[in-house]
Amino acid sequence: MSELIELVGFLHDQNPQVRMLAVQHLLPYTARNHPQFSIWFHNDFEPVKDLKALLKDKPQIASQAVTALVNVSQNEKVRKVLMDDEFLQLIFSIVTNPLHGLADLSCMLLCNLAKEEDFARILDMQVPLREFSLSKNIIDQLMDLFVKGTDHGINEYANFDFLANVFADMTRFERGRKYFTTLQEYDHVIPASKLVVFTEHKSLLRRTGVAAIIKNISFDIPFQKVLMDEEGINVLPYLLLPLAGPEELSEEDMDGMFDELQLLPDDKKREPDHFIMKTLVETLVLLTATREGREHMRRRKVYPIIRELHLNVDDEEIREVCDQLVQMLVRDEAPEELEHIQDNPPDEDDVIVEVD
C-alpha cells in the first residue's frame, strides 16, 4: 500500500509526463471490486480531488482522468466528493462544448453522479448559451444535446446516448419528474414529449433510458391525461409499436387501433431487449390507474397487441405483466370507483457505468 500511496502522490506532480504515467498506472485500481480500491479514500480522498483537477490538464491526461473518474464514481463515498458546484460546472462545460472530445465520457460520469438525489440541483444551474440551444439552463441544454445530438449531429465525437440514463435517474425523484412533465418557457414544449420518440431508436442505451423515464413519470396520475392526449404527447403508439409483431390481426381487432399499428410488415420485429419490453408493459399497467385511461386504451385496441405479445414472447415475467394489463382492460367497470395506483416508487435505475 505504501507504494500505491507514493504513486497517487504523482497525480499532482509538476511534470505532465509524470502525471500521465501516474494516472495510467492507477487505472486498474479504479475497478470497484479491486481489493485496493480504498487507495482512492487516502488522505480525505486526495487522489479523487487530483483526478478532478486533471480534467483541466492536457487532453491526453484529461482523457485518462475522466475514465478513472467514471469508474471510481461507482462508489457512493466518492460521488459525494464529486458533487460540488465547481466540478459539476466543469463537467457541463465539457459536455456542452460541441468541439470537445470527452463529451461522451463526461456523460458517462454524469450517469453515476445522477444516482445522488442532490444531483437535482442542476435544475438551478446555468451555463453560457450555445448555438444548439436557446436556454442557459443546463438541464435544457442537456435535453437539446440528447434530442439534436444523436448520431453525432452536434459533436462529431459524441452521440449523448448516456444522457438517457441521467434523465432516467432524475425522474426517480419528484423534482426531476416535475421538470420532464412541465412546459418549459424557452421552447414552449414539455420535455417528455421530446423523449417518447426514442422508444424504437437503434441505441439500446437510449431505448432503455427513455423507457425508464416514461415509466417513472407515469406514476404521476394527473399527468397521465397529458401523456395520453392525442393532441399532445400521445404516448400510447410509442409504447405499443415496440411491443407489436408481424402477426395478422382481424378487422375487428384493428377497428380503432392507431394507424401506425395496423397492417405492420411481415418483417416487423418486437423490442429485442426483455428488460425494456417489460418496462413498456409495466408502464401501460400504470396508465390503467384511471377509468379514463382504461377506456382510452380499450378504444385504441391495446388488448390485441398485448394478446399477441403474450402468445409470442418466451419470458415468464413479461407474460405475467401482460396478464395484469389484460385483467385491467377486460374487467367490468363499477359505476363509481375509487381510483388508485400501485404504491411503488419510480424505478431505481441501478445501471452503474464503468469503463473497461
Swiss-Prot record:
Cellular component per GO, a single term: nucleus
SUPFAM superfamilies: ARM repeat
GO BP, sorted A to Z: chaperone-mediated protein folding
GO function term, MF aspect, one: protein folding chaperone
Pfam families, per database record: DUF383, DUF384
Protein family per UniProt: Belongs to the HGH1 family.
Protein name, entry field: Protein HGH1 homolog
Organism name: Schizosaccharomyces pombe (strain 972 / ATCC 24843)
Lineage, broadest ranks: Eukaryota, Fungi, Dikarya, Ascomycota, Taphrinomycotina
Gene name of this polypeptide: hgh1
